[in-house]
């Protein structure tokens, strides 16, 4: 079973289709052969994500999303995805996209990280960008 919960931390939940979010998360996880998952998507602030980035990755910078898989072993994913609404809004302006589309892209990107995809090299970035067009 796959469950997706939306939460907010210091911000109002964005007006985004929760059914779409649940559906796309379930589709991605199922396509990559994960039938057991619990995802919590937490919409938050730049301050919170910067703090998490510094604490867990030793990098002091703004970021649009951070993903944590809390499950150590097995096929099940117990994931927390933190999303900075301000970064998503800034990204949308930079990439000339509407907020909704950019928010959806960031959610897909975050789920891919939970599945083990990375974006540190140019090859990895290219692969993730292709998969973001889910």
Predicted regions located by residue number:
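Periplasmic solute-binding protein
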Residues: 112
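An acidic/histidine-cluster motif and surrounding catalytic segment
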Residues: 1-104, 115-134
């Amino acid at each position: 079973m796959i469950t997706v919960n939306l939460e907010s931390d210091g911000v109002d939940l964005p007006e985004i289709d929760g059914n779409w979010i649940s559906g796309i998360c379930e589709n991605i996880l199922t396509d990559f052969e994960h039938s057991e998952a619990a995802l919590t998507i937490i919409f938050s602030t730049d301050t919170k994500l910067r703090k998490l980035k510094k604490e867990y990755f030793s990098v002091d910078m703004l970021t649009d999303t951070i993903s944590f898989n809390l499950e150590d072993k097995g096929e099940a994913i117990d994931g927390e995805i933190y999303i900075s609404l301000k970064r998503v809004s800034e990204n949308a302006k930079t990439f000339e996209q509407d907020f909704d589309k950019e928010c959806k892209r960031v959610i897909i990107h975050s789920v891919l990280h939970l599945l083990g995809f990375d974006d540190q090299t140019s090859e990895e970035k290219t692969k993730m960008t292709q998969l973001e067009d889910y």
